[in-house]
Amino acid sequence: MYNSFPMRILRKLLMFFGLLFVAAGAISSLIGELTGIVTFSGLQNVSVSCMGVVTFWLSLERVHPEGYKFFLIFILLSSLLGFFYFPLGVLGFLLTIFVLWFFRDPERMIPSSETGIISPADGVICKIEKTLAPKEVKSSEELLKISVFMNVFNVHVNRAPVAGNIKEIIYVPGKFINASLDKASEHNERNILVLENNKNEEIIVVQIAGLIARRILSFVNLFDSLKIGERFGLIRFGSRVDVYLPSSYVPKVKLGQKVTAGESIIAS
């Protein structure tokens, strides 16, 4: 996916335009110093050079393919706005950078499955409690629920908390309440995965849309086998992930603690 031909071309284009922006800003400044001919103002030269540096950096950063279509839309609009009024072009470019940064998908140092349950999402632990499974899942057992809230600045690619087979996938349409609130687990749009690990335990993972997030993306299908830390989905622009574990598990995190998807141990 990341090394496909279209992705390689897009990364090379980002690198090319990044270097082009840096060169344009530097050459414009040099011409102004040597000849007195002002092609851009000092602020514009600095802005163009900064845009180049950031664009070049993004060509090196791993970005989820879902973000590239947003990049193309924003960069075209930014170019059009900048043609008519430079400050608007800079603003549009900054929004473009934020969109690409939002869809970043860095590699993670994934621990072995014997160490425990890893966090499915980047963010902050917002709930730890004993409760029942989501009503859409047929289970009457008391479970340990650990919730991770993701704000718009977190990485939003979700990863499998355990290795296992997908027994059930349930999509539930709903509202878009602030995902940090308890009622979001019951009322918001969500996607439920039921995994069975090598101990025949059921691990339930729920992706929940938030106040800004309007779409949950799933990369997996029923009966797929997932490795621990494997990417299974993404939620756009602020959201939450709930994990339901057998009650025998002990939480290894506390409320308010920051966690990293694919790396942080949340229970064992």
Regions found by a protein language model. Name each.
Residues Y2-S268:
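Contiguous, well-folded functional domains in the mature portion of proteins
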